[in-house]
Amino acid sequence: MSAEQAVLGAALLDPEQLTHLEWLAADHFYRPVHQALFDALRKLRNDGHPALSADGPLPLSWVTDAVEEAGQHVRGLTAAYAHTLIQACPRTEHAPVYGRMVLEGAIHRTVAQHTIRLHQAARADAVQGEVEGALRTADVLTGVLTDLARRWGTDPRPVPPTAGPSAATDIPPPAQSGQVAEDERFLLAVLAEQPGAMDEVVAWLRPGDFADPTHGQLYRCLGALHHRGEPIDRITLLWEAQRRGLLANGTVSSEQLTAVCEGMVPGSADWFGQRVMRSSLTRTAAASARAIRALAQDEVLGPGRLINHALHELGPLDEVRARWATANSSPAPKATASTPSAGEPPPARVKAARARSTP
């Protein structure tokens, strides 16, 4: 607040300082009365106020006219407060530095405000089963960060925070709805029981997209079986989970895995996969918003670092968004006669199994 008072006091004392503050905007000030006064000073300067060409000491009309002009747009501004602003300025020639202090505070506030909007949009989309609001708000935030970087004079580029992990890691994620968990179980059942189902989602769905870490581990097992070209069913899934120690460490029990596989309902892997992906996208958007807001609330963090760290925190959302686009643009899998027969397994699977069994 003192920086806002100082820069306004400098402009009231020396209108020439406004020429060094072209990069500063009225909405960078926190208080509405300061915004109105800065706008008024700039308007009087642009209109060629007589005080600017007067010889000798600056006429008092420069101050009174600025107060009168600003008073048309905001209440509470008096000539007495204008003189308070003048007294708050130690040195008029330091106005550009005071202005950068004002801009620094504005950058922190602006980033925080837009992350709140992103978080709200992500939560609303999660309830409605949509993603468009979160994606649109994320685009706005990216544009704001780029514009703030230009105003601050820094190159906008993603830079990871140097002090420890992401700010979002200490914040627990919001509780997941029963529908999300149900979608994940249905998807796993389809993938385990429907031949060729993994081909529909393997290109764009990742274990981290599952809200339940156990479901993510089971999907990782299915992905490993698919990658090695081995048959996929509830028995091989249990086998892979056992090999990975998921049963030994209590991540999942054989009864839980059987229950998941027996919960298969009509539907395609692509359809359930996109529902899981949609939930992952809104969850990631909310996590990015929380992380960036924590950065914006750190007063020690300079604007350049804040902007670049914020761009870095948007990286996970960009990655999920790219896979979401792939999921929605990929052609539907063609129906093929690739269902395993009751006879000999395909040679590739035999070779993979033997190679895997060889010491």
Predicted regions and their residues:
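Generic structural concept
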Residues: 34, 38, 112-115, 219, ...
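Long, amphipathic alpha-helical coiled-coil/dimerization segments that form elongated scaffolds
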Residues: 96-97, 107-123, 281-297
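N-terminal targeting/assembly segments of extracytoplasmic apparatus and virion spike/baseplate proteins
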Residues: 323-329
